[in-house]
Regions:
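Extracytoplasmic "Venus flytrap"
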Residues: 16-40, 64-70, 91, 164-173, ...
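Extracellular/periplasmic Venus flytrap/periplasmic-binding protein
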Residues: 71, 118, 126-236, 273-280
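C-terminal segment of classical bacterial N-terminal signal peptides
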Residues: 1-9
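Beta-alpha junction/loop-to-helix N-cap segments that form part of ligand/metal-binding clefts
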Residues: 14-17, 30-37, 49-122, 131, ...
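Venus flytrap/periplasmic-binding-protein-like
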Residues: 65, 109-111, 115-120, 197, ...
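Periplasmic-binding protein-like
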Residues: 79-92, 110-112, 160-165, 212-222, ...
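Segments of small-molecule ligand-sensing domains
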Residues: 293-304, 315-388, 394
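Extracellular/periplasmic periplasmic-binding protein-like sensory domains
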Residues: 232-311, 406, 417-418
């Protein structure tokens, strides 16, 4: 099922085509809807305010995949001949399927803060990008944050940290890093898998009640997150020792648990909830004109903002390519160059209407950018997230060698000769 959300009459020769693999339906629709609305609204904003990107109108087409990998791949195969500017897979499972396909089709693939971590090695994965940061890097920032809270990294020795994770490619992604860090810092790691969709967690939390780990870190998704918070409250596990990853830190994850979620924390790579110049423009050019994809009251939510960010990066890559190559509608190779030469400075964030966001720099070798991580805390009475940390640097000295080893293995298995970045 496809639905053109942003339509105009420009001919194919003078329009930027963008495809959206969305999940407004299915088990994860409560997360998929705000995400998809952010996707659509940003492109509507560019068309309404700027006449598109570089004066070229954008045509956006959603393909509803219901968070189903097989359907998402079918969507991709059906729409790839339109040459989408940037393919955004919207799930780790889909990312793994599309990495080899997009490389053959010469279409850039961006999985923002999810997907295959070792795809950060641009010499092996020239068509794939996973900036601003990855699950492995996030895991190092979480352990740094916990260590600092305990009074120093040496205080982790002898402590127990549980990882409650969605039993999927996504949920397992942080485990190798957490194991390496457990050896490095001497904490005991409990690995507790939760099967899809995550409504049955009694056995998991019974183990936590027995073992009483010092901290619980969660890589959850959808209903798994709110269920976990309710189960933690039921065994009186302290919320100030329970930290979610950035897919376990949206309003949808905490609101169903009510007052019990108060004090719960999560990682994030952006702030939410604030009025920004970008939000003001979205209201003025999109919602005030009756062209919004959703409810204007929800444009401050975590997942909506993440949807916006996906298309901010995709369209910045298109803009980079237009300027560098002197073209109106860049090719896949040219947009790939635009992603690989992405450098979003403080001044760029001001221009984009999101002042205060951290700088991002992508290179030929590094498709992740090593972006630092923020932590936020939920206030159940105010129903809002508050950022409570500075930007926490990631341990690149730990994760980059792991990424390079995994990428080298992938290259050997797939007969890929790593390119020379010069």
């Amino acid at each position: 099922m496809t639905s053109p959300f942003v339509v105009n009459t420009a001919s194919a020769a003078e329009q930027i085509y963008q495809m959206g693999l969305t999940y407004r339906t299915g088990p994860y629709a409560p997360n998929g809807v705000p995400f998809a609305n952010g996707f659509a609204d940003y492109l509507t904003l560019l068309n309404e305010r700027d006449g598109g990107i570089g004066g070229v109108p954008i045509v956006y087409e959603e393909c509803e995949m219901g968070y189903n990998t097989k359907v998402a791949v079918e969507c991709y195969e059906k729409l790839k001949s339109n040459r989408p500017a940037v393919v955004i897979p919207n799930s780790t499972g889909v990312t793994y399927q599309l990495i080899p396909k997009t490389a053959v089709d010469k279409l850039p693939l961006l999985s923002m803060g999810y997907g295959r971590t070792s795809g950060a090695v641009g010499t092996v994965f020239p068509w794939y990008f996973n900036f601003p940061t990855t699950y492995w890097s996030q895991a190092t920032a979480v352990i740094s944050y916990i260590g600092a809270e305990m009074g120093g990294m040496d205080k982790l020795k002898g402590k127990t940290i549980a990882h409650v994770f969605h039993n999927s490619a996504y949920g397992k992604e942080a485990n190798p890093t957490l194991k390496v860090l457990a050896e490095k810092y001497g904490y005991e790691l409990m690995l507790l898998a939760v099967d899809h969709p995550g409504q049955e967690q009694k056995a998991t939390w019974l183990q936590i009640r027995k073992k009483r780990p010092d901290y619980v870190f969660m890589s959850g998704w959808g209903i798994m997150n709110s269920t976990a918070i309710k189960e933690a409250a039921a065994i009186n596990y302290p919320m100030d020792r329970f930290i979610g990853n950035w897919w376990s830190g949206s309003e949808n994850d905490v609101l169903p648990a009510g007052a019990a979620a108060n004090g719960y924390r999560s990682a994030t790579f952006h702030a939410s909830g604030a009025e920004t110049p970008l939000h003001e423009d979205i209201k003025k050019y999109v919602y005030d004109k009756g062209k919004g994809a959703g409810d204007v009251g929800r444009i401050y939510e975590v997942l909506y903002i993440r949807g916006l960010l996906n298309h901010i990066f995709a369209m910045e890559a298109v803009s980079n390519a237009q300027k560098h190559f002197g073209v109106k509608v860049p090719s896949g190779e040219q947009v790939r160059w635009g992603l690989e030469n992405m450098h979003v400075t403080a001044a760029d964030w001001e221009r984009l209407g999101l002042p205060g966001f951290a700088e991002i720099k992508v290179t030929c070798e590094d498709h992740e950018g090593g972006h630092p991580v923020l932590f936020q805390r939920w206030d159940a009475s105010a129903k809002s997230w508050t950022v409570i940390s500075d930007w926490i640097p990631v341990m690149r000295d730990v994760v980059r060698p792991m990424m390079e080893a995994d990428a080298a293995k992938y290259a050997a298995e797939n007969n890929i000769t790593p390119r020379d970045c010069g």
